[in-house]
């Protein structure tokens, strides 16, 4: 990653010849000219403008390399009338329901202007679709044969270069393309409309690129891609309608310190091979040179040497060039002449960079007119706003030079149209957006396989080029690069998740088991700086499992299947280029899958009361956790490890290894004895040892001495009833190391734990709701009733009847607290009990609120706003899409002045992801003297409602005390409601 870093139209027509008569070649009618947008002109829609919330298209498998229709999965009769999904997503596609058929013999008729690479791709497609013989232009057309006619036609003035039209209706197929690559793009779409039975789905397509230049950068630090990887990538780029590849490996010294020297012969041959493959795929090769560390910028000789190098690279097949100065100093020159000519500082550096760029750009324009513009990567390529360097560069740089930037930040979470417009105003030149996603050289423990997100459509439309910087893992990069290509082609209707699923299908090449493995790998490596939830497909399975665990309706089958796919991922991907690239991550994923299955086995054994199986799975899981912790790659961050940790804790609670009255006290002396502070009533003794350990469990009975309780079980998990008073327990026989845990369970300890919130608010005349949590503390199921004792004026309802608490588990019991009308507004103590354990719940009876949101008409202020994009007023403007954000400061605050003083009864906060873990709600009558109305010490974010009863409130303030994230505070909205009259 670069850290610190109207043309002619070719028409192609296909017609089915029936007998001696030919069905006429048809075209599209009623199409209007372009409406025009920033960047590329946008042709008018075929039928209507699609709504922004258009229903998602159903993704269908794409393959890599291009699929042979005979190898793809047959479509069901129900789906045969619908066209397959096309990627990148077309701007306008309408099914016609009338397919065409590829016959065994096809007559190909081409004109002199037909793009030879498009025709070659078409020939390949027809053969894959079932054509056994393709005849040339001469000779009669055989009866019943499919006729392919390619010739010059009228210019499609309403389509930008790269646009195309395609119609399949009633046995006639017509394709036309604008510019040198439009016909090629039409063939790529036609490829995806061909069905396994040799028919072509009926459809009308009118499509064009939303970004003129779209592509991929090989710009990471580390081992560059291989010859095979680059060639395969160019084929992938052709299929996904990308048209620019920028060669900029961080490890290539011949474009950096040794830029003056020619490449070795082998590398030059490789570049020529790349150039030929790029031409076949309509991809322009770009070469980036970074001479700043080894160039005298004031030297005419050095500038001429740089021009000679670019000309040499052009002879090898590179058609576009980028000059990079992102890693240079403002105070250090590489020759004394530079200091004498330019001086020092940012403005001097800008003048020097502009001088070199202008010289190269003028040479290219004079020698190769009509070619791509030179791009300059400036030293300040990621900063925000105007600086001395940027202002000087804008004035000194020739108008024809484009400027590269990465957005605001080296790897920005988002890039907005406003940021692009601001940068363009500052540089006063066309901008090339060099997006540093999915590149991972700054986080080498990760592969970023999530979809391209966080970029507004205006970024694609307003950029002279949009290039995504790939990872060192070329095959794996195809997943996010596929989605980036989809965005760049049609940014307005880009759907990240649908595009991402199509990318997985593309890389799976029609193999269902491989597709499942790819989905598991990518699903557990989807998060990045751009955001996105990790392991999103697993989260609902995990939540469902924990919610139903231990019940008759336990649902673990889906989770078990997911873990099985994870475990099998290395085997399912074996033999593919991808497997070698991502082996560290697939191996780690397989370990997580194996660990997940062990966790499910362990929890299942607990549920069925099988101590031996549970102990075996626990030991297996522990060993796998050690191997997982030793790995140097990250997979399923924040999801997989927490699940395993929770499962281990569930077993430890079940086995009595956690804290509490029955906790394992670790042993004393030789490690096989646990002594009690005083004699206790024993119920059960649990011993967990290495399988095959021999020994005897004994209890020290006061006045009697050691009494034998029983022998150790060969499985290693032993549970023996005691039912006596003892001062100690021990295991005799084995060495201390073979006994892992010795756990006494006491009969005189509480059978269960009861947890309730300390306080609940209940509106007078209404009902407050909470949940009581009961946890079993015995080596068996616990049964009992949850009872309530409430004062007069408070009604409490709990689930009736006898409750069963499974061993080692918790049960949540809904509790409803009702405060009848007329009850005084104050606090009431309610006693809840389960067996011998009880807890006190404080019920705060609060007055009801009514009326509109008072904050909506108030005037907002804050201690400070993060940026002008997130002002204080955004938190009470009624718009759910806007928010206030503070700088990174614990003590930041937001407040609103109400339109009139009120008796305040309720405040509702809706936090963005950056929330407060501790804060206060303060009120004031004059905005100077404040009093605390509510205190929150364990904020959870999301929607938080606070009840109060404060009089004469004219100001409401949310005073932050402790941030829950590395960011500041961010509120979508703040609402305030008055007490009802």
PLM feature spans:
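Acidic, contiguous N-terminal accessory segments
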Residues: 2-15, 19, 71-170, 197-205
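Feature activates predominantly on carbohydrate-active enzymes
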Residues: 159-309, 315-319, 326
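Catalytic-core regions of glycoside hydrolase
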Residues: 179, 195, 220, 257, ...
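C-terminal functional modules
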Residues: 495-663
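Disordered, acidic Ser/Thr/Pro-rich linker "stalks" and the adjacent N-terminal cap
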Residues: 620, 624-632, 636-695, 699-705, ...
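Short beta-strand-plus-loop segments that form exposed binding edges in beta-rich domains
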Residues: 731-736, 959-966
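Short, surface-exposed loop/turn segments at beta-strand-coil junctions that are enriched for proline
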Residues: 818-824
């Amino acid at each position: 990653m670069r850290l610190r870093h109207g043309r002619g139209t070719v028409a192609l027509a296909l017609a089915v010849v029936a007998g001696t008569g030919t069905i006429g070649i048809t075209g599209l009618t009623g199409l209007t000219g372009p409406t025009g947008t920033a960047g590329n002109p946008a042709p008018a829609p075929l039928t209507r403008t699609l709504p922004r919330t258009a229903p998602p298209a159903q993704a269908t498998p794409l393959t890599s390399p291009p699929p042979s229709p005979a190898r793809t999965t047959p479509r069901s009769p129900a789906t045969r009338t619908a066209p397959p999904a096309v990627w990148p997503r077309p701007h306008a596609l309408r099914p016609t329901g009338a397919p065409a058929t590829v016959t065994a013999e096809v007559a190909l008729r081409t004109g002199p202007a037909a793009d030879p690479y498009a025709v070659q791709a078409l020939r390949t497609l027809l053969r894959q679709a079932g054509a056994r013989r393709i005849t040339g232009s001469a000779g009669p057309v055989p009866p019943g044969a499919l006729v392919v006619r390619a010739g010059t036609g009228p210019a499609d003035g309403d389509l930008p270069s790269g646009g195309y039209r395609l119609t399949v209706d009633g046995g006639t197929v017509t394709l036309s393309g604008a510019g040198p690559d439009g016909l090629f793009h039409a063939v790529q779409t036609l490829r995806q409309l061909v069905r396994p039975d040799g028919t072509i789905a009926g459809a009308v397509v009118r499509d064009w690129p939303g970004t003129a230049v779209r592509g991929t950068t090989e710009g990471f630090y580390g081992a560059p891609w291989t010859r095979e990887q680059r060639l395969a990538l160019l084929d992938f780029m052709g299929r996904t309608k990308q048209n620019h590849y920028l060669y900029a490996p961080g490890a290539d010294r011949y474009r950096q310190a040794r830029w003056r020297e020619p490449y070795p012969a082998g590398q030059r041959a490789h570049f020529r091979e790349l150039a030929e493959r790029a031409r076949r795929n309509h991809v322009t090769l770009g070469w980036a040179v970074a001479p700043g560390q080894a160039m005298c910028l004031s030297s005419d000789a050095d500038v001429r040497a740089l021009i000679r190098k670019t000309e040499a690279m052009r002879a090898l097949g590179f058609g576009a060039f980028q000059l990079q100065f992102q890693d240079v100093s403002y105070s250090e020159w590489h020759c004394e002449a530079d200091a004498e000519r330019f001086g020092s500082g940012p403005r001097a550096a800008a003048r020097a960079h502009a001088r070199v760029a202008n010289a190269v750009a003028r040479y290219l324009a004079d020698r190769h007119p009509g070619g791509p513009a030179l791009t300059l990567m400036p030293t300040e390529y990621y900063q925000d706003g105007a600086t001395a360097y940027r202002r000087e560069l804008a004035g000194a740089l020739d108008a024809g030079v484009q400027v590269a930037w990465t957005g605001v930040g080296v790897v920005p979470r988002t890039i907005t149209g406003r940021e692009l417009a601001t940068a363009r105003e500052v540089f006063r030149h066309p901008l090339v957006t060099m997006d540093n996603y999915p590149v991972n050289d700054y986080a080498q423990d990760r592969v970023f396989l999530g979809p391209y997100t966080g970029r507004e459509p205006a970024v694609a439309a307003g950029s002279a080029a949009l290039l995504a910087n790939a990872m060192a893992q070329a095959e794996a990069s195809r997943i996010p690069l596929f989605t980036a290509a989809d965005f760049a082609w049609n940014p307005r209707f880009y759907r990240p998740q649908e595009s991402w699923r199509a990318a997985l299908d593309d890389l799976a090449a029609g193999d269902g088991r491989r597709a499942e493995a790819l989905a598991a790998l990518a699903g557990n490596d989807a998060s990045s700086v751009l955001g996105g939830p990790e392991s999103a497909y697993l989260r609902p399975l995990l939540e469902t499992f924990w919610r139903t665990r231990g019940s008759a309706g336990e649902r673990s089958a889906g989770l078990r299947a997911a873990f099985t796919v994870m475990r099998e991922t290395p085997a399912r991907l074996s033999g593919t280029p991808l497997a070698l690239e991502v082996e560290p991550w697939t191996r780690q994923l397989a370990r997580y899958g194996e660990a997940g299955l062990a966790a499910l086995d362990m929890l299942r054994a607990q549920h069925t009361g099988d101590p031996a199986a549970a102990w075996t799975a626990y030991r297996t899981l522990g060993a796998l956790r050690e191997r997982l912790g030793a790995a140097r790659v990250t997979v399923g961050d924040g999801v997989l490890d927490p699940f395993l940790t929770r499962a281990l804790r569930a077993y430890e609670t079940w086995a009595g290894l956690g804290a509490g009255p029955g906790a394992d006290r670790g042993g004393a002396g030789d490690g096989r004895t646990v002594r009690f502070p005083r004699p206790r009533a024993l119920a059960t003794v649990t011993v967990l040892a290495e399988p095959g350990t021999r020994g005897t469990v004994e209890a020290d009975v006061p006045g009697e001495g050691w009494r034998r309780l029983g022998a150790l079980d060969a499985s290693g998990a032993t549970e023996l009833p005691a039912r006596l008073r003892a001062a100690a327990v021990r295991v005799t026989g084995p060495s201390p190391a073979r006994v892992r845990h010795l756990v006494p369970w006491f009969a005189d300890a509480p059978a269960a734990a009861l947890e309730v919130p300390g306080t609940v608010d209940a509106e007078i005349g209404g009902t407050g709701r909470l949940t009581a949590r009961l946890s079993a503390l015995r080596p068996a199921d616990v049964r009992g009733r949850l009872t309530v004792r409430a004062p007069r004026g408070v009604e409490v309802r709990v689930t009736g009847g006898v409750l069963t608490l499974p061993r080692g588990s918790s049960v949540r019991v809904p509790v409803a607290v009702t405060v009848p009308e007329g009850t005084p507004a104050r606090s009431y103590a309610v006693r809840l009990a389960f067996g011998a354990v009880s807890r006190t719940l404080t019920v705060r009876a609060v007055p009801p609120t009514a009326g509109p949101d008072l904050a909506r008409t108030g005037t907002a202020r804050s201690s400070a706003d993060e940026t002008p994009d997130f002002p204080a007023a955004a938190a009470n403007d009624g718009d759910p899409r806007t928010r206030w954000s503070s700088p990174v400061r614990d003590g930041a605050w937001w407040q609103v002045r109400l339109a009139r003083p009120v008796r305040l009864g309720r405040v509702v906060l809706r936090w963005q992801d950056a929330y407060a873990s501790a804060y206060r709600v303060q009120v004031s009558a004059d905005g100077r003297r404040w009093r605390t109305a509510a205190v929150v010490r364990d904020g959870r974010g999301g929607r938080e409602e606070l009840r109060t009863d404060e009089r004469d409130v004219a100001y409401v303030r949310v005073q932050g005390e402790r941030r829950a994230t590395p960011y500041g505070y961010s509120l979508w909205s703040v609402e305030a409601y008055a007490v009802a009259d």
